[in-house]
Every structure is written in C-alpha cells, then in structure tokens.
Amino acid sequence: MSEQEEKCLQRPGFDGIKSEHLKIIAEDITEPLTYLIKKCFESGIYPSILKKAKVFEKVLSTRMIRYLKKFKILSENQYGFTEGKATSDAITKNVNQIHQNIDNRIPSICIFVDLKKAFDTVNHKLLLEALERIGFRGNAYSLIESYLSNRPQSVQISGSFSKEMYIKCGVPQGTVLGPLLFNIYLNDIFQINCVGKITSFADDTAILYEGTDWSDLKNVIENDFIKIIRWFNSRKLSINYSKTHFLPFGSYARHLPNYTNFSFNINDQKMQINRVPNIKYLGVVLDHHLRWDIHVNYILKKVRFVSYKIKYLGNILTEKYLRTLYHALIEPHLTYGILAWGAACSSHTYNLDVFQKSILKIIFKKPKLYPTEKLYADVRMYDIRQLYFLHSITHYHKFRSYLYLAPKFYDIIPKDLKDLRFGNCFKRNLKKWLHSISRTEIHKPINTNIN
C-alpha cells in the first residue's frame, strides 16, 4: 500500500470515522448495509445521509457500468473515466490518423475544444433526460434523480470543513458517480451528423478534419463546427474561445494553409478560433509536422527537475532503491504517450538520450565515458528507441490495430513470440528477447523510416 493510500485510510470522513475502524467492524455491518442498499434500489430513493458516503455510490456505479457495457451505450471514442482506456489511447488514436494523412499528403486540421467549468455546469434536467433516453427509467431514474437533488457540498481545508452549500447544477465533485454521469451527459455529441471525427477524454474534446485541399477544408470546418457549437450550447456547456485552438498538419511549412483563424456566426454573434504553432493535448505537445522536438524538450524539463533528487540520493541509497526511484520518477515521463512521439528522429531525441545515459551512470556508478552499448546491456534497461519498440509491439499484439511503424516492427520478432497469447507471458518473453539482441538492431528499422 502506498503512503498516500495509508493517509486516506487514516483520514476520517464527514462522520469522523476512519476507514481502518470500519474494516474492523466490516462483518457486523455488512448485513444491515446490504439490506439498506437493497431497499434504496427497490424504492428509488437515495437517502440524504448516504450522499456523503461512497459505499452506496460504488454499488450504484458498478450496476450502471455493467448496464452501459452490456448494451454498448457509451461511444468508443470516449476515453475518460473508462476501464481499459487511458489518455495515451486517445493521443495514439489521433496521432496515428494524422501520421497517415501527412504521409499521404492529405490536408488535416484538428480543433481542440476547451470548455468553461464543464463539470460544474452540467444541467441536472438535461442529464436526467439523457439517462432516460438510454434506458434509465422507473426506480433507476428516480434513484439518480434523488441522488442529484438536495445535495450538500463542502470543502475540507487543513482538517476543517466549510459550511455546506446545496448544488443546483454540475456533477458532484470528488464522488464515484460524478465522472460516469459526465460521460453519459457528453455521450450524445457522438450522435451529431458532422464531418469531423470527435474524440473526448472527460472535458477535453478534439475534432479531426481531413479534406482534399486547404481551401475546401476551411469551408467544411466553418460550416460543420457550427453543429458542434450548437450542441454544446444546447447542453448549457460553454466553449472557452480564448483557449480553443486549431492546428493544421503537414510535412513542411509550405504544405500548410495560409489562414490563421475560423469564424462562426452564432445567434448574431461572431465567434473565432485561432491557429497556434503547437498545442499541449492530454499532456503531449503536438506541432504542425509531428516532429516532436518541442515535446521532447517538455519531457526534458520534467525529468531534469526530478533527476536532482536521484543525484542527491546517489551516495545515500543502494542501487536497488535508486533503480526503483528511476522506474517511479523518470521512466513514466519517458514512456507517457510514447506510441505517439517515440518515432521522433534521433536528432530531436538526442538530448533526451544523453540525459537518460547520464542518469543511469549515476544510479549504477559508471564512469562518464562508459560505453553506451555496454551500459544498457549491464543494467538491463531500455533506451528511448527500445521503449518505443516495446510499447508498439505490445499494443499491436494485443489489439491488432493500425499503429505507426508497428507492423514493420512485428515482422522482426520471432514467430514463437507472435504465437503467444497476449498476457504476462508474452510481455515477459518479449522483454527477454529484447535484451538478447543489440540496440542497433532495434534502432535500424525505426531510423530507416523516420530519418
């Protein structure tokens, strides 16, 4: 159990009772609690006192998720708060399509929508209507209506609670059900008959457009995006136009359009979306040409900040603990979104490669001029290219879906690996095989295709 999880168990709830105390009496309260929850489902009433608790919410959430999965109600293009999906999946999906468009010289533009306080402005009446449309009726409808009504909310600061206020809109913050209800509220956007391909992660929405030429694409977007604006307006969700931007993609600057904004007339008001040279999307910095130099510099800033801790502890902790720190503090930054940016050309990842080697030499007490090939072989760690290869093969073997360069990588691995079912056995044997061959054999197919 992590230190943060231990603190959560020690911290009491609104009633002053700690989780660790509840665990002691769990057997004694299970039966009456089960009876109470059963009666709530039968009556369609969510008791006010339980609105401050999470147990009933978790049961209700589990049943709702089971129903949504059974009838495949939520769109496949929703990635937020969904089991088995992550921000990196949304990034990979869009970047793969953009890569294909750039390779085929297809003009493409992505609009990144920013919403003003999306979670706080969800309209309860419209949310209940959305729930009814997807089959929540009778007691199920009444139960969620009861859950949302007369709901108090307060803030805890330094152990003290603020005065309770009753919320009239928005999904309850810090709750189990809140994110799920927001997904349901947003789900209808995928039913809009629009040209753009919509991807969402919570309140981060991206719409990807592609066309035959830049001029026609501008006309398509200015006509099509109005539908999306109207949908947000109909759901009482406000677009923050000052933070909503678009990014065109192409191989070179000469392949990009010359316009810098899109204009929309909504209810006699002129709205404008401006073009930007790069944008941070779900923690990954995209640029016009998907060269990733800006994103790599962004990663470098983060890992350099963390590396000072490792350098400081280098003479205090053992190699075992320093390795653990590396995997906990450095490697997550190197692997986040790597399926999108891992194919950046070596000149753009050079500084990151140098950083990784230097930090590994500190951890494993190697001299500055220690040979790179021998370093990675000795410490049995992966460089950036190997991490990209590893994650690409793992993703491709699991989903068998298109992934930039992954099919070419897949041809390299042995047949007995390909024949394994996806799981721990496959991943373990893939890592073992990856350690058995030289780094240059992995670098070659990547560098051949991108440099």
Model-assigned labels for residue ranges:
Residues 2-172:
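Conserved pre-catalytic core of RNA-dependent polymerases
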Residues 118-134, 194, 206-230:
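Catalytic palm subdomain of template-directed nucleic-acid polymerases
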Residues 1-54, 161, 175, 272-280, ...:
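Surface-exposed loop/turn segments and immediately adjacent short secondary-structure elements
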Residues 1-36, 42-46, 99-107, 229-247, ...:
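Short, charged alpha-helical motifs in flexible N/C-terminal segments and linkers
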Residues 60-78, 103, 179-208:
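Active-site palm subdomain of RNA-directed nucleic acid polymerases
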Residues 270-340:
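Basic, alpha-helical interaction scaffolds
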Residues 161, 223, 238-277:
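Short, conserved micro-motifs composed of acidic
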Residues 52-55, 78, 108-118, 170-178, ...:
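Catalytic palm active-site di-aspartate
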